Amino acid sequence: HLAKKTLIANGCDEETADTLSTLIKNAERDGSLSHGLFRLPAYVSGLKSGKINGKARPVISKLTPSVVKADGKNSLAPMVLKYGIPELVKAAKENGVAVLAITNSHHMAAMWPETEAIAEQGLVAFACTSYKPAVAPAGAIKPLFGTNPISFAWPRKNKPPVVYDMATASMAMGEVQVAKREGHKVPIGTGLTKDGKETTDPGEIADGGVLLPFGGYKGSG
């Protein structure tokens, strides 16, 4: 597998490379190109710079019976989730509700595989993460909010879970970057140029511009 070999060659151990390459493969399979091979160069850059520890293992602890903490030790978030989710599920089944708080990790990646897996165990799942400012509120031209994606899933009897994953911007920044790479335009209302003008050019949004909130002005609230 290309992704796995590349990750190992740039500082990941076998388990980390296998975990991350599986996520990349599944994102490509599901049509989420912004979380597939597109992400590999950024992972390699982080590994080479030392920002990401490709051999780290998270430390999992219980703050309360319902609160699980995962210190990622500068690993990639998929590794943290691999170790943290079993403890989260166990705590939720024992107490009725539980939270997993993650620190010191890099790039949450796609979140729906994890919320879907939790829902397949009969639990309702909700996940969220923050992102650097990239979204301007309605009427503004400077970024204030992150794209701050969320994902949720819930089980259904004798049916696959309902699963939802979205950025709280008009579009995920990764999708804008993919559109730029492939030469596609984006819908009007996706974002603004660095001068605050509406544009359908993803390059003008990704390179110094800003995204707009999902749902137009209502998304600013």
Feature names for model-found ranges:
Residues 209-221:
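Internal helical hairpin/lid segments
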Residues 1-10:
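Generic N-terminal amphipathic, Lys/Arg-enriched alpha-helix
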